[in-house]
Regions:
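A generic alpha-helix propensity feature with a strong bias for hydrophobic helices
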Residues: 54, 92, 132, 240-242, ...
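Small/flexible residues
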Residues: 29, 54, 71, 105-110, ...
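A short linear-motif detector with a strong N-terminal bias
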Residues: 47-50, 114, 121, 170-172
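Long, intrinsically disordered, low-complexity segments
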Residues: 1-39, 121, 126, 152, ...
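C-terminal substrate/ligand-recognition segments
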Residues: 59, 63-158
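Coiled-coil-like amphipathic alpha-helices with heptad-repeat character
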Residues: 22, 47, 98-103, 238
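An aromatic- and glycine-enriched ligand-binding surface/loop that stacks and positions planar moieties
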Residues: 1-89
Length: 255
């Protein structure tokens, strides 16, 4: 959903990095790491882009609270504690409901260079697109083209890898659910909701209340007056630079 993720400023090497990557990960400076977590997880990153309870609930509904894919994707606070991660007393993670993504944790073994001396950074490769996304796109295309058997094969290849029971038939709703779970935090959800025509309902209250997670639990400290998906969000705004270069380009409605 973020348009400006990369600054290509050749004169400032500091500017040539991905803003989204900085926001991902855990707020490790506010945490204590013990045991397995201390051995595996690199320090750094800011702790934004955390999963909502609604995503956790969707996983539980689809595969149970002990689902293999759920355990590899996100953890609740009790599971984080069992892994060896504790939020320090007096610290908090803004925009968090007590769930953290596990799939994007930065492992020491993946680090090109340890940059834990500065909280924002870690040097590790990011996945831009996975084979699972290709399969899900193919499944949707085949289903809409009248090839449900091929679509079923595509989606079950993902489910088998995730140790889920294969489906015996497939619908568009099956593909929507599978894509939400398999590709969460991989920059596909917003665009999918828009093109499916589901965004207005699915994102109706998005951004209304902002959670804050601390060692005392979850509190709701702020409520926005403007929130949710609006008609203008069907299209992204046209950048000012493009409109300056071509005055004939009109800004999209609402922006």
């Amino acid at each position: 959903m973020l348009e400006l993720q990369w600054r290509n400023d050749q004169e400032q090497a500091w500017s040539q990095w991905d803003f989204t990557f900085v926001m991902q990960g855990w707020r490790t400076g506010n945490m204590t790491f013990e045991g397995k977590a201390a051995d595996e997880v690199a320090q750094g990153t800011y702790g934004f882009l955390n999963p909502r309870k609604s995503l956790y609930d969707a996983f539980v509904k689809a595969e149970g609270k002990n689902g293999y894919r759920l355990q590899k994707t996100l953890l609740n606070s009790d599971q984080m504690t069992a892994y060896g991660v504790k939020l320090n007393p007096g610290q908090n993670i803004y925009g968090c409901e007590g769930y953290l993504f596990f799939k994007n944790r930065i492992l020491k073994s993946d680090n090109i260079m340890d940059a834990s001396f500065f909280q924002a950074l870690q040097y590790t490769d990011r996945k831009i697109m996975r084979y699972a996304e290709v399969l899900l796109l193919a499944a949707e295309a085949n289903l809409e083209a009248g090839n449900p058997d091929v679509a079923l094969k595509d989606i079950n290849e993902i489910r088998l890898r995730a140790k889920e029971t294969p489906l015996t038939s497939v619908t568009l709703n099956d593909i929507k659910t599978e894509k939400r779970l398999e590709l969460c935090l991989e920059s596909t959800r917003f665009q999918d909701l828009v093109r499916w025509g589901d965004a207005k309902n699915a994102l109706a209250s998005q951004g209304k209340e902002i959670p804050n997670y601390s060692s005392k639990g979850v509190s709701w400290d702020f409520t926005n007056s403007t929130f949710g998906f609006q008609d203008k969000h069907m299209l992204l705004p046209i950048p000012l630079k493009e409109r300056e270069l071509n005055p004939n380009i009109q800004q999209n409605t609402g922006w």
